[in-house]
C-alpha cells in the first residue's frame, strides 16, 4: 500500500511493469491485480484460487511466482515445498486457467550466517528445478527464480537468481 497508482501518469510511466511483492490479502485483489504485470509472492492455495477467480471474472491471465516457505522464521509466509508439487499438478489438470506460473520467489532466513543463507537458497533452487521438471508446460514460461535481497543478493546470483530485490540498498532501511 506504499505505492498509490494515480490517473494521469506521465507518459514515461506507460512502459513501467509493476511487480507486487509481499503478502497479498484476498480483499485487496481488485486494488492490485489490474495494475501489476507480476505477483511475486503467491503464498497459499487460498490466494491462488482467489487470483484465478478474479482473472476469470475479469478475463485477464495473471502472472505469478509461487513463494515456498523454507526459512527458519515462522513469521514468513509460503507454501510447503510439497504443496508446490500439488499446485503444479492442479495446474497441469487445468485448475488455474487464468494464472500463468512464471517461477518461484523465496527469501532466505534473516541471519548473518552465510551457510544458513546458502542452504535456504539451495533448497529453493531444488523446489524451482523440480517444478520445472514436473511438466513440459512450465519449461518456457516457468523461468523466473526470484531470490536475494540487499544483504544476500550476491549469494543469490551464485544460485541462479533471475531477479533480486534491492529496496534497502536503493532507498535505505525502512523505519517501522
Language model features by range: what are they?
Residues 173-176:
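Short, charged, intrinsically disordered terminal tails
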Residues 1-151, 159, 171:
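Conserved alpha/beta-domain cores
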Residues 160-162, 167:
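Active-site-proximal glycine-rich helix-loop-beta segment
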